[in-house]
Amino acid sequence: TVIPEIDLPGHMLAALTAYPELGCTGGPYEVWGDWGISDDVLCVGKESTMKFLEDVLAEVCELFPSEYVHIGGDECPKVRWEKCPHCQAKIKELGLKDDDHFSAEHYLQCYVTSRMEEFLASKGKKLIGWDEILEGEVAPNATVMSWRGVAGGLQAVRMGHDAIMTPNTFFYLDYYQSLDKENEPLA
């Protein structure tokens, strides 16, 4: 079974380049040719952005028979949301607040994850997200895919969630599979 992944709300430079109105700054944006984490993420304070995500996920649900859809949720800097009037208005509307552990912007991402979980459930699908979705309030039925080690997976299970263990140091096949890099250069 192929489980599709549409990484959101970060890792969206291609979408922002094509649809700059989906971002907090309005662009212009440019697709990167190299790996990286961009401060430019989707503006989740705009209802039009949320509708875009639902439209994309609806199409993904039609294309893939898997009961799961992976929404990513990793590596989403909050710096644009901190200054974005749309995101700040949504934070106020939802009554989100900073606490001792996370910022209101982290809880804004929790809102996005929960909303996407509800949407996917309406299509008969279940949500998977990278272990960053544990930062704040986890969507009630989310499966957590732990890539930054084993701690996230263990935390998810303790919280009653299913977990998929994929710690990058062991399961990323583009990493060296041996400490002997002279004789094992396949990475």
Regions found by a protein language model. Give the residues of each.
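Substrate-binding cleft of carbohydrate-active enzyme catalytic domains
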Residues: 1-123
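A cross-family glycoside hydrolase active-site/sugar-binding cleft signature
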Residues: 3-9, 70-74, 128-130, 145-147, ...
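Short, hinge-like loop/turn segments at secondary-structure boundaries
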Residues: 20-23, 88, 145-147, 181-184
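Generic structural hydrophobic/aromatic packing signal, biased to beta-strands
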Residues: 22, 42, 53, 71, ...
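A generic secondary-structure micro-motif detector
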Residues: 106, 142-143
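Conserved alpha/beta catalytic core and glycan-binding cleft of carbohydrate-active enzymes
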Residues: 124, 129, 134-140, 147-187
